[in-house]
Amino acid sequence: MPDLFAYTDGACSGNPGPGGWGALLRAMDGETVLKERELKGGEKETTNNRMELLAAIHALESLARPSKITVVTDSAYVKNGVTGWIFGWKKNGWKTSAKKPVKNVELWQRLDAAQSRHDVTWEWVKGHAGHPENERADELARAGMAPFKSSGKSSKG
């Protein structure tokens, strides 16, 4: 059975502002790439954190069947949220420890549902540090953002 990886990234021009998300999905056999798929999309008015979340969500939602997958992100917000904070938020009715509503709650709930179908390992990598797959996810996120720098649409592809 191949090893599955999803490399995800979000980008924003201004925060808030036009933004994009990108995901590179790979099925690997050791060092050999068996299959690769690229996903991207964006929004006219968003935040970097929302784009980071959507990259991970779309990567997991794109899998046709329950899978064992490693999701690699350069977002400490996503990694820390999904592997730690989310358990307290759910226990507290989606409120933070300060009793405030969780920001981007609808995306966190969607990510929680998406990952519940799979056996997910989460890894963090430093962004813009020469990690080729993370750099490709960044390129996809920027490509996903490009149409929204001058229009008011939302896209997924």
Swiss-Prot record:
GO biological process: DNA replication, removal of RNA primer
Gene3D superfamilies: Ribonuclease H-like superfamily/Ribonuclease H
Pfam family, one: RNase_H
Membership in a protein family: Belongs to the RNase H family.
Role description: Endonuclease that specifically degrades the RNA of RNA-DNA hybrids.
Gene Ontology MF annotations: magnesium ion binding; nucleic acid binding; RNA-DNA hybrid ribonuclease activity
Cofactor: Mg(2+)
Top-level taxon of origin: Bacteria
Record carries keyword Chloroplast: no
Alphabetical keyword list: Cytoplasm, Endonuclease, Hydrolase, Magnesium, Metal-binding, Nuclease
GO cellular component term, pick one: cytoplasm
Subcellular location: Cytoplasm
Domain RNase H type-1: 1-146
Enzyme class: hydrolase
Cofactor binding description: Binds 1 Mg(2+) ion per subunit. May bind a second metal ion at a regulatory site, or after substrate binding.
Annotated binding of Mg(2+) 1, by residue: 9, 52, 74
Chief site of localization: cytoplasm
Species this chain originates from: Ruegeria sp. (strain TM1040) (Silicibacter sp.)
The protein, known as: Ribonuclease H
EC number: 3.1.26.4
Assembly and interaction partners: Monomer.
UniProt catalytic activity: Endonucleolytic cleavage to 5'-phosphomonoester
Residue numbers binding Mg(2+) 2: 9, 138
